[in-house]
């Protein structure tokens, strides 16, 4: 049997760009939108993109999505345990 192929979920054309934001960026995000961390949409720590990023519960992921009408927009999700 040949060696296992490496696969990155980020190489797929339908998967948008993801990144873990810093603590400073997280605080600014919450302040800008006047929300609490618990009010962000959630993403499970077992999500393939989260695993590949090495994010842990409590981190916030910024997702850069493309839109035919809005161009590019940012979406934020809180990493939670399964």
Curated annotation (Swiss-Prot):
Catalytic activity: RNA(n) + a ribonucleoside 5'-triphosphate = RNA(n+1) + diphosphate
Chief place where the protein resides: cytoplasm
GO molecular function: DNA binding; DNA-directed RNA polymerase activity
Domain of life: Archaea
Keyword Nucleotidyltransferase: yes
E.C. number(s) listed in UniProt: 2.7.7.6
Location(s) in or outside the cell: Cytoplasm
Family the UniProt entry places it in: Belongs to the archaeal Rpo5/eukaryotic RPB5 RNA polymerase subunit family.
Function (record text): DNA-dependent RNA polymerase (RNAP) catalyzes the transcription of DNA into RNA using the four ribonucleoside triphosphates as substrates.
Assembly behavior: Part of the RNA polymerase complex.
Protein name, entry field: DNA-directed RNA polymerase subunit Rpo5
Protein species of origin: Thermococcus gammatolerans (strain DSM 15229 / JCM 11827 / EJ3)
Gene encoding the protein: rpo5
């Amino acid at each position: 049997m040949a060696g296992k192929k490496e696969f990155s979920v980020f190489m797929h054309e339908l998967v948008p760009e993801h990144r873990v934001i810093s603590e400073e960026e997280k605080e600014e995000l919450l302040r800008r939108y006047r929300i609490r961390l618990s009010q962000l949409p959630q993403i499970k720590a077992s999500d393939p993109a989260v695993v590949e990023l090495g994010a842990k519960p409590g981190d916030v992921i910024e997702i850069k999505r493309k839109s035919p009408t809005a161009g590019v927009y940012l979406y934020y999700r809180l990493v939670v345990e399964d």
